Amino acid sequence: MSLRECIINGGDETNPDGTPKLSREQRDEALRTFDEYKSQLSLKLPEPEADIEAGRMTFTALEKKVRDRNRRKIMQLRAQKQALLDIQSFRNIGGNEDLPLAAQALFAKDERAKFADAETLQTVYLRKATRKLDKMLGSMRRNILGGIRKKAQMENVVREMMGTDTGDVAAREMGEALASVFEDQRLAFNRMGGSIGKLEGGYFPVTHDMMAVRSVSKDEWIQFMMGTERAGGRDVSAPTKEARPGLIDVENMIDNETGLPFTPQKLEIALSNMYDAITSNNATRSKPGGFGGNGSLASQRADHRFIKWKNADAFLEYNNQFGGKELFDVAIGHIHSMSRDLALLERFGPNPATTKRYLQQYLDREAGLRKDEKFADEVSKANAKIDTFYEYNTGANLAPISSRWGNVFAGIRDLLQSGQLGSAFLSAFGDLATQNVARASAGIPQIGTLTKILRNVSPIQATKKGELAVRLGLVADGWSQMASAQARFTGEMVSPEVTRRISDFVMRASLLSSWTQAGRWAFGQEFLGFLADNVGRSFDELPDNLRRTMQHYQIGSDKWDIMRATELYDYNGAKFLRAEDIANRTDLPPTVARSIETDLIRMIETETNFAVPSSSMRGAAMLRGSSRPGSIGGELLNSFAMYKQFPVTLMNTHLMRGVAREGRLSKMVYLSHLMLAMTAMGALSYQMKEMAKGRQPMEMFSEDGEPNMKFWGRAALQGGGLGLYGDFLFSDLNVYGRGLADQTAGPVVGLLSDVKNLTVGNVAEFAAGDDTNFGKEVVGMASRYFPGNNIWYTRLAFERLVRDNAIRYVDPKANARFRRLRRKYLKEYGQEYWWGPGEEAPRDRPRLQNIIGER
């Protein structure tokens, strides 16, 4: 009896309890697997032998599937058990158990939690990957226009990865490093329950432009892939078209389900399914309640790697026609995507969505058992936040409801940033305060902070300094991503490339990008160097603050002994304790080495975010909730959230750390240190911004030494990231002429209001016989929103020589308005202009003695 007959009979036979020995699903799966093997083997073996071999291979394949399912079940149970242990160990600010807060901390970073969260783990896996790409990132890093350097060499990198010898030694080395990163991530994915096969002949990820693929029919797309000669010799090309070869290596493409080469018919079915998935944005692969497809994250991604290109030229031809175009971005995007999935797998097991629901059900059950209305309300809110955080973890909330309107509004936000954040660099001096507080908290020496930052900002040997930072596993977003610097003020956003390039140019030209990256590099290098300086000390001998910081990340004496026994990394005489060197130790069990590596990266990355506050998932969720782009509600929330990310992040980091410290004295010391440092740096930023606007510095103290409370109120808000709101302390309008309601609604709403006033408002005024001031309003809008108009070192010249003259041309009362504005600041704030509105040249120079009340 053949195995096929046994399978059919197994569906008819029953167990003693009356259930079938094989369920319908099991029988159908076994029959499908057998038939696929049989059809492939029949092409090269006689019927009896093909039947026997197909039976053997079917049995082996089904056995492997059972093993894989059981392995994933065990890993899933283990992840769920660990999640429960972690949330039960969590203590809130009062030192009490708090299950609702604890469960949220598994998804988004919470200063009170000592365990790892999915948000931080994503960054950990990203740092593990990019540290091998120092040469590639240094060579290909983005220029001031946001473009990739050496695009042609990136094509050589791809050719080398796919087996073509280009003769470009640097490209070969970069290709080997990138291939190693892809392989490391594949193996890590498989360790956590996945089953991604290794593609022989080299692998480079392919992305698909949905709109480009939609522009051709399914038949045309499959023909483009397979060539005009298709399954069974069927030629589907039009009679007038010349025959053309396909791009994929049909003979050597392996069916992941069978492990054998595809039959032409099966390959065509696979490509048909692939076309449907691309053009439907994966909707054809989705099932209700699943994670981006079939529910189990670990069982995904294997189908992405069955395409085997004939050669690198074939891949590049597809990429130019239907792919993501920019090869560097495709590679970095793949690393980011894999890092996201690896974080979810490590924290929540092979099926993260199931673990999420398990935790929510656990909270619901606890609420039912405790019969406490307040606790039940907290659980309800926590479960809603968990859903929101999970959408951020998976990136589901970035998909616009309407891609057309989502892109339109994202582009508008980019352009607004390019026209309004040109002087944000002057606000970034607050980083010196947060660096100071973060270093003190971790026990790191605070001497020379500014010098180290400026050394990294300097363009001298910029590539070498950056490559060192990457090798140390530090952030390199400014090299690999566009629009990374403004994310600390606006949050992460997806937008059209053209507007993103404009915004990115302003951030780089204004020095905000280099300042932000330099600050993060300086802190990370100092921390790793400080650890290296202390390897001669036992855990108990470490400085108190450093020891407490390490304990917060679950690094105790046992882990520290392993870390300090690791050979230090030497760079021109400077010693560093690198996570990579711990992971590469062959004398440690791999699981132990990887665990300590993760703890060290998690500590460095989290503390760096305290030193240079950046956007956070928790902050984005607080401001935007679970809204998605492309909808009215989502776009209104995106407008509201703009420029508010920094103060919210500050609240979720430093303020939360301060109130979470043990003992009232410790809380007071930390928070007072933070407040004084931020206010001092806020004062510096405010005075710099005033001088950049052409005004003399504002008096900080009167002649008799009394503090100017108007100034210090503004300085405190400036230091806390609320500089725009400082204007509302003493007036109804801010410096942009907006009221509190308009400012709170956000820049997009403000722009729409300006457009309405310029159009509908002027029409109404004209109809009523009133003066319209149309020309003045046009000039005002153009100067307010023109990209790069307020870059801090050019804004004053632009305003005086271009804007003011344009206003004079369209407004006969311009000079009178300019005089009123100068008198207003002198009367209300005691400030004169050193280069005032309407003046052709500076009348004075900034008088720094004004700061202390001297005239």
Regions found by a protein language model. Give the residues of each.
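Low-complexity, small/polar and acidic-rich linker and loop segments
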Residues: 2-184, 198-206, 210-215
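Extended amphipathic alpha-helical scaffold segments
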Residues: 162-194, 416-438
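Short linear, low-complexity motifs centered on an aromatic residue
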Residues: 192-208, 443-456, 657-665, 763-777
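Long, charge-dense tracts
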Residues: 214-343
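Hydrophobic, often aromatic-rich secondary-structure segments at membrane interfaces
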Residues: 302, 306-426, 430-712
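Short hydrophobic helices that act as membrane-entry/anchoring signals
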Residues: 420, 427, 431-438, 634, ...
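Short low-complexity linker/loop segments enriched in small residues
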Residues: 654-777
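Hydrophobic alpha-helical segments
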Residues: 764-855
